[in-house]
């Protein structure tokens, strides 16, 4: 909770990644990736609840065996659709979508994103970073075209390189009703 606002962290995770199948169960220093992400989320000062959202029973079983909450969802092409599916069933003011492949998330960064979003009364926060050499040619780095602080477009390989293209970070922070409405955009 931050400023009397409840915050649920949802970690979307699936086994069928095209670039790295079974990625959530890959071990990092002896612990599965999805658990490392949940462990990072647990260090935030503000999350009232942490839920792993998955279409895979094996992930749900693993997560629950470690004391975390997990929900089964339908199959989805994007993480935001997976999070949106469960958003209407959440009793919270905000939802933080923490990507299931972000095991090195600094809890201070997560907390800053929450503070920034709530303090500025934003509907959504999607942080970006400086472009590094090779980012624009790397299909594993999602690029964002930004104009006046607003995200206009996301892509894997930029079709046009401009000064307004930045790599995104694997974090999305929403007012619950905003992510709940996301499923209606299809």
Where does each model-flagged region fall?
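Short glycine-rich anion-binding loops that position phosphate/pyrophosphate groups of nucleotides
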Residues: 15-17, 100-103, 131
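Short, high-confidence coil segments that cap the C-terminus of an alpha-helix
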Residues: 47, 92, 119-123
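Short phosphate-binding loop-to-helix
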Residues: 51, 57-115
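Short beta-strand segments
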Residues: 12, 97-99, 127-128
């Amino acid at each position: 909770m931050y400023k009397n606002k409840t915050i649920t962290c949802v970690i979307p995770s699936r086994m069928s990644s095209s670039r790295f199948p079974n990625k959530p169960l890959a071990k990092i220093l002896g612990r599965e990736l999805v658990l490392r992400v949940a462990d990072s989320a647990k260090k935030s000062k503000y999350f009232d609840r942490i839920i792993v959202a998955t279409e895979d029973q094996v992930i749900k079983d693993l997560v629950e065996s470690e004391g975390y909450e997990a929900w089964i969802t339908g199959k989805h092409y994007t993480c935001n659709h997976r999070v949106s599916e469960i958003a209407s069933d959440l009793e919270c003011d905000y939802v933080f979508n923490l990507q299931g492949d972000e095991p090195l998330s600094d809890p201070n960064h997560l907390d800053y994103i929450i503070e920034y979003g709530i303090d500025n009364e934003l509907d959504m926060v999607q942080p970006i970073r400086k472009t590094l050499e090779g980012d624009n040619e790397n299909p594993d780095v999602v690029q964002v075209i930004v104009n006046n602080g607003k995200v206009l477009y996301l892509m894997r390989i930029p079709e046009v390189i401009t000064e307004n293209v930045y790599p995104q970070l694997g974090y999305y922070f929403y007012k619950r009703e905003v992510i709940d409405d996301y499923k209606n955009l299809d």
